[in-house]
């Protein structure tokens, strides 16, 4: 459909009845969707989504949590896909019936619906060409198009027939299983009868086989035709599966969010018909218990690949002697990596919607790998559900078999899309890792050097040279123990990529070729296997030379009791040890191939070489997002809180070359009644102290006292849970100590039991559990303590992914504006990059300055959005800083909050506004009964997955 075109299909808006989607009209809001209960706001959401997909736009959609965003995405996107496929079939039927294709001067772009039409009809002809030549070329193009459509239609018909057979096969599966069991019982009875006859008094016993001779006995023969009949696989199946139909890739951040989305698909009107497949990591989908027990993601990945390659390499010579087939089945040591069984798993996964847990159970039952089986289902799937880290990383995307050409991508929970893309492609390596990798590689060459070919030796020596120069640029010596090396110069140095290559004296090495060699040879995996097998042999050598090697081997062993007893630092607890230092360094080498203007290298020289680091900082995340936008038909970026949208427009879309006209914004209001939320901006405190928590003023005693007094007053009128966010952990500790010293903490404790967010990720769930239990107890006991106060940190463990719905968060307080550290070298470099790259809009701040404000407001929006989580929820939001009253700042709040904000110049009217609504807003209104403890724990699951993925 072209933007501004006419209507296609009947259009109508009805009441809360069951609808049938039948078309779209861009100049009308009349759309009917297949969903039983559909609020008007959700109709607008789905109608706009449909238009974005039809017109091939880039959409930024905001729909607050609890407003039915997932269901709207499902119904809007799948309705478009269904209509798209229907129009494609109708157009193909018309072309096949008439035997002619569309000419180049036809205006309706929707006639050429398939990628197979590209380059067929409509080829511009040179000026002055004879008419008969033009007519001949057009006729030939039309015939070619019709022939292609016939072939495509035949393939689609075969695929649909096979999928119908698959659905029928799933229904007959258990009946066939019972027949197999009966057959096995019959065979067992026959075998027992033969044994009884053979063991008779006059029976002649066969000669006892010697050890090893069992392998010489012929196994039961089964022909290829019998296997084919048993599995239902025909010769053309591979060809059918290779064709990627038009599909929707739906991405989200965590596996739990994806599972929830799949559950919503099952409940939707499309649940019985859509072909859906869920993709995940090996850690989530592996069914081999020996591999799963390794725990670490990298260890699981290494072992999986090694098990696939080991037997294949051993039997490579024997396979070459066999008659070559069109596609040979790989030999694999893993019993679940069986192509025939994985094909069956693929078929059953497409027959009906399954989430990841069901896919895992199916893999165990069928003894097939769900990780690879799910990838086999991608071509025929209509809806592919996957973590968006898998989509944004080009190598992972290619390895998974994901093809984005002319497809639709929907990225849900996309508020952290820029940060995730940046962190995925930013790499930091330590001096200790560089020395460990160098020592391992030297030992590997000593062991196998005589068996290696010249080209292998050449690349290994280049890698050794690179490692040596990386250590040298930090000021260390590769031959000495990194833990005992003290650096003469300390501090941080930031360089462009080219300057770093020149300073390191590695500008003469082709890093692209080295990166390719590492990928193809899998040297890091082989090196890790080498350290596992022979680490003990080399541990007897002198300590200084092999310190890095031994330290790596020791890191693989369980920690000692003393180490476990020591308090773990937050960064150490959240970052797992890599399986191989070289594997991590390969990521750094790949990052150095980025364009010079898109990244920087930060040299951080600490006291010792082992603590010093080299970090690649990606400045332009759009360079990795541009390929997605370029290939896809349409891209939708959706989330509960997408403000400030200018962040996405500038850093992600404008830098990716997306024209402003192609970007469509849509913000959906909240479904809660207007009086269910009370957002306040308080400009001065109880003692009329102006509230402006700048870096220079926030440490003043009177400012910290004002926060305490305001909280005391709020806790006196708000029943239930109060969550107060501070800009940083350090400031929270400082304020807490000041309150304790001045007595304000005791006054607060008399009204609310006080909880404090832990810095360790492992203690978050415990604190949340105690907090929710305290609120439940206070609700049952009418005493002086009316609830609990949770002191949290913006950007911490509880500002994202934890839902403070209902009584868990009746009031959310934001202390100050949580601006990022402006003195950070990384932030300053990003600001400078944006100032140089993006133009300054008239009347707007410089792009670099706007970035700082956007980062602040994004953190604020994520924190205050924790309170309202469903339609019948209610809470107050208090922003303690007069800077929130500025129009440019208010404009970056979510629309549903911004429309209801009340700015109070003094504290008196503010607390009066809270007191005015208190009798009905907090005490008398009955909220929906919910299990706060289980809800808190489910919310904490998001944080566990987030920590694991990081």
From Swiss-Prot:
Its EC number is 5.6.2.-. Binds 1 [4Fe-4S] cluster. Pfam families: DEAD_2, Helicase_C_2. [4Fe-4S] cluster binds at residues 286, 304, 334, 369. ATP binds at residues 63-70. The keyword Isomerase applies. InterPro entries: ATP-dep_Helicase_C, DinG/Rad3-like, Helic_SF1/SF2_ATP-bd_DinG/Rad3, Helicase-like_DEXD_c2, P-loop_NTPase, RAD3-like_helicase_DEAD, Rad3/Chl1-like. Residues 191-208, 308-323 have a biased composition (Basic and acidic residues). GO terms for cellular component: nucleus. One of its GO terms (molecular function) is hydrolase activity, acting on acid anhydrides, in phosphorus-containing anhydrides. DNA helicase involved in cellular proliferation. Probably required for maintaining the chromosome segregation. Belongs to the DEAD box helicase family. DEAH subfamily. DDX11/CHL1 sub-subfamily. This is Putative ATP-dependent DNA helicase DDX12. It comes from Homo sapiens (Human). The gene is DDX12P.
């Amino acid at each position: 459909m072209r933007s501004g075109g006419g209507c296609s299909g009947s259009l109508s808006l009805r009441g809360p009845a069951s609808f049938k989607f039948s078309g779209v009209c861009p100049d009308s809001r009349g759309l009917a969707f297949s969903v039983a209960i559909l609020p008007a706001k959700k109709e607008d959401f789905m109608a706009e989504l449909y238009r974005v997909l039809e017109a091939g736009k880039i959409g930024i959609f905001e729909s607050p949590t609890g407003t039915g965003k997932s269901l709207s995405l499902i119904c809007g996107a799948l309705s478009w896909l269904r209509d798209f496929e229907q129009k494609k079939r109708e157009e193909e039927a018309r072309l096949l019936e008439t035997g002619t294709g569309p000419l180049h001067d036809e205006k309706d772009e929707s006639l050429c619906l398939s990628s197979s039409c590209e380059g067929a009809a409509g080829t511009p002809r040179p000026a002055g060409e004879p008419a008969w030549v033009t007519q001949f070329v057009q006729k030939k193009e039309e015939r070619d198009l019709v022939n292609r459509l016939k072939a495509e239609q035949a393939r689609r018909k075969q695929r649909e027939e096979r999928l119908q057979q698959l659905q029928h096969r799933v229904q007959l599966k258990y009946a066939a299983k019972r027949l197999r069991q009966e057959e096995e019982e019959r065979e067992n009875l026959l075998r027992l009868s033969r044994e009884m006859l053979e063991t008779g008094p006059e029976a002649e016993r066969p000669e006892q086989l010697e050890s090893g001779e069992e392998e010489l006995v012929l196994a039961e023969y089964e022909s290829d035709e019998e296997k084919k009949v048993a599995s239902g696989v025909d010769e053309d199946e591979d060809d059918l599966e290779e064709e990627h139909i038009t599909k929707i890739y739906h991405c989200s951040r965590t596996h739990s969010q994806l599972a929830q989305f799949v559950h919503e698909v099952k409940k939707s009107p499309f649940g019985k018909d859509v072909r859906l497949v869920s993709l995940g990591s090996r850690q989530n989908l592996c069914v081999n218990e020996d591999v799963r027990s390794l725990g670490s993601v990298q260890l699981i990945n290494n072992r999986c690949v090694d098990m696939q390659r080991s037997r294949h390499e051993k039997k490579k010579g024997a396979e070459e002697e066999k008659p070559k087939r069109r596609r040979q089945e790989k030999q694999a040591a893993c019993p679940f990596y069986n192509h025939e069984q994985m094909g069956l798993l693929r078929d059953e996964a497409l027959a009906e919607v399954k989430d990841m847990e069901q896919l895992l159970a199916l893999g165990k039952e069928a003894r097939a790998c769900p990780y690879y089986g799910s990838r086999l289902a991608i071509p025929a799937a209509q809806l592919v559900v996957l973590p968006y880290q898998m989509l944004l990383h080009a190598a992972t995307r290619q390895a998974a078999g994901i093809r984005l050409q002319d497809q639709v991508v929907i990225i849900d929970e996309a508020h952290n899309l820029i940060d995730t893309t940046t962190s995925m492609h930013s790499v930091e390596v330590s001096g200790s890792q560089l020395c460990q990798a160098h020592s391992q590689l030297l030992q590997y060459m000593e062991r196998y050097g005589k068996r290696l070919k010249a080209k292998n030796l050449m690349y290994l020596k280049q890698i050794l040279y690179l490692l040596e120069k990386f250590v040298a640029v930090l000021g260390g010596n590769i031959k000495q123990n990194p833990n005992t090396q003290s650096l003469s110069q300390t501090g941080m140095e930031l360089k462009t990529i080219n300057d770093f290559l020149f300073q390191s004296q590695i500008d003469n090495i082709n890093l692209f070729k080295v990166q390719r060699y590492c990928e193809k040879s899998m040297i890091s995996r082989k090196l890790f296997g080498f350290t596992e097998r022979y680490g003990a042999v080399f541990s007897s050598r002198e300590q200084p030379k092999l310190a890095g090697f031994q330290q790596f081997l020791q890191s693989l062993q369980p920690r000692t009791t003393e180490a476990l007893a020591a308090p773990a630092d937050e960064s150490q607890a959240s970052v797992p040890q890599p399986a191989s230092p070289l594997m991590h360094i390969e990521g750094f080498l790949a990052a150095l191939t980025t364009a010079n203007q898109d990244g920087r290298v930060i040299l951080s020289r600490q006291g010792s070489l082992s603590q010093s680091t080299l970090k690649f900082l990606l400045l332009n995340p759009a360079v990795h997002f541009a390929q997605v936008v370029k290939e896809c038909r349409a891209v939708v970026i959706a989330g509960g809180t997408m403000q400030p949208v200018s962040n996405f427009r500038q850093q992600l879309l404008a830098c990716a070359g997306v024209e402003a006209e192609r970007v469509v914004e849509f913000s959906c209001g909240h479904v809660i009644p207007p009086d269910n939320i009370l957002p306040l901006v308080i400009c001065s405190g109880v003692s009329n102290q102006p509230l402006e928590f700048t870096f220079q003023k926030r440490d003043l005693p009177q400012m910290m006292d004002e926060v305490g007094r305001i909280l005391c007053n709020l806790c006196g009128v708000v029943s239930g849970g109060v969550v107060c966010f501070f800009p940083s952990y350090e400031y929270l500790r400082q304020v807490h100590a000041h309150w304790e010293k001045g007595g304000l903490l005791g006054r607060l404790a008399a009204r609310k039991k006080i909880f404090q967010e832990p810095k360790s990720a492992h203690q978050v769930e415990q604190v949340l559990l105690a907090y929710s239990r305290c609120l439940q107890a206070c609700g049952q006991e009418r005493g002086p303590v009316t609830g609990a106060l949770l002191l949290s940190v913006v950007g911490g463990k509880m500002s994202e992914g934890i839902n403070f719905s209902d009584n868990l968060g009746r009031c959310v307080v934001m202390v100050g504006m949580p601006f990022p550290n402006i003195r950070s070298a990384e932030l300053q470099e990003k600001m400078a990059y944006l100032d140089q790259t993006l133009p300054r809009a008239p009347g707007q701040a410089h792009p670099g300055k706007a970035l700082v404000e956007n980062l602040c407001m994004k953190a604020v929006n994520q924190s205050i959005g924790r309170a309202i989580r469903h339609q019948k929820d209610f809470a107050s939001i208090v922003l303690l800083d007069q800077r929130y009253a500025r129009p440019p700042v208010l404009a970056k709040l979510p629309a549903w909050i911004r429309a209801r904000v009340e700015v109070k110049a003094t504290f008196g009217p503010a607390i009066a506004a809270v007191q005015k609504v208190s009798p009905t807003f907090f005490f008398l209104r009955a909220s929906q009964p919910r299990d706060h403890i289980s809800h808190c724990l489910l919310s904490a699951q998001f944080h566990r997955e987030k920590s694991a993925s990081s």
